Amino acid sequence: MFGRVRRLWHIQRLVSRYGLREFVDGKPRGEGPREVRLREALESLGPVFIKFGQALSTRPDILPPEIALELAKLQDRVPPFPSSQAREIIESQLGKPIDEIFDDFSDEPLASASVAQVHTAKLKPEEPGAAGFDVVVKVLRPGVEVSIREDIKVLRTIASLVETLHPEGRRLCPKAIVAEYEKTILDELDMMREGANCALLRRNWLGSPLIYHPVVFFDYTSEKVLVMERLDGISIRELDHLRDRGVDFSVLAERGVEIFFKQVFRDNFFHADMHPGNILVNASNPAVPSYQAVDFGIVGTLTPGDQRYLAENFLAFFNRDYRRIAELHVESEWIPVGTRVEDFESAIRTVSEPIFGKPIKDISFGVFLLRLFHIARRFKYQVQPQLVLLQKTLLQVEGLGRQLYPDLDLWKTAKPVMEEWMKDRLGPGQVMQRLRREGPHMAEMLPELASQAIKSLERGEGLGVGKKTIAQMRQELQRNNRQQMRATVGAALLVGATVIAVAGSAHFPALLGMAWPAWLIDRKS
């Protein structure tokens, strides 16, 4: 507890030192531009806050441009730790001197991030005379786990205060969101897990002309060290460079939409850390450019029920079927029982209808999202912590989409992908596959169920379907329905946000803790 109080005090001191109260009252404080002071303060606070800054850097629509531009530097300019420490970690983890693993190892980091830093190297060839493989070596930052765990404790304290003191604290579920954030960010610290994530994405997209994932060298990968193929793509941040190469941004944007939907629905495994530093473009064929993915520490999955109900919401939204969206939310009980479907339908239509027919460049997503939050408050919608990761990633992807092709017809591009998925998922072929998969088990259970029913009747117990049992069954059905409907975060909070967000997403690829502070800021505003 003392450590948390000390950390909170440290944060307060940094706010004063860097004059950050200027962002609240508008009164100039400190030396130098306020955006530089904000970036330096976030760097001083460590990985959790750096990630927050990274998320904000993709939101020039809700931040002044100079602040968004400065926060983008957090992605490349985190001070590196000494290469001597990196060498020690590599040798300790892999059990060999570096010279026995690599023909060449660069002491100058290629990139330095809040969780790890990356060095370039060349693996020793397996056969004499052969060429070594160009690789990148990702090394976990020393002491980062201790630092993150301390900041998680601070976030827990803040979340508890918000849940207790804020009028809408319970609905926002801040403690549950922090718990999800903790799991996600701690998973990011395991390099072996990241390598496995990359391997699965590579398998899902092997041979695809849309996106490429690097080879992972598991013989040289451990909990704190990851060795993978070095890619030579152009960062998506270098728009002028891509433009000079003649890259067709419209094709790039359309391919991004396709990748997003296929990762979420076809593969049920998506890249969830989509800041610009993690997206490269292969411009070798500018007319049909493709993507290259890096950094796989954060990924997401959905349950089959999540996928189905998200798909229903997407398609209803694309078809402007606001009645169906409202019905789904009322049925799921994510909004209070007794809510009139007509009222919720009208609220969704009011916010959503104006965005159709507009290019993304003409849509203020920040204003749109604030309106969606207003609907959520009005209908006492329960925030779903398990989907904050997805929502947070959508915010990142939306920021990237604005950098590509603002005139993309998102609805025309995305709708066929979703309809094809629904057809494959719910068509006769899929039903037959499920029957073949589950039929033998069901057939095996039937005799036992019949035998138990007969024995109950012989004992004079009946089948026991009294009023109490019926009530229990109803509760169980409702509970199962709520579980199945988790994915319906709501058109007001997710569906509308998604379809705007994905215009130009590279691949769907988080750190979900950035979402709940945004909600708290919205509450205060």
Region locations from a protein language model:
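Helix-rich C-lobe and terminal helical cap/extension of kinase-like folds
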Residues: 3, 25-33, 179, 222, ...
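ATP-dependent phospho-/nucleotidyl transfer catalytic cores
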Residues: 65, 72-79, 91, 145-150, ...
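Hydrophobic HxD+1 residue recognition
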Residues: 272-276
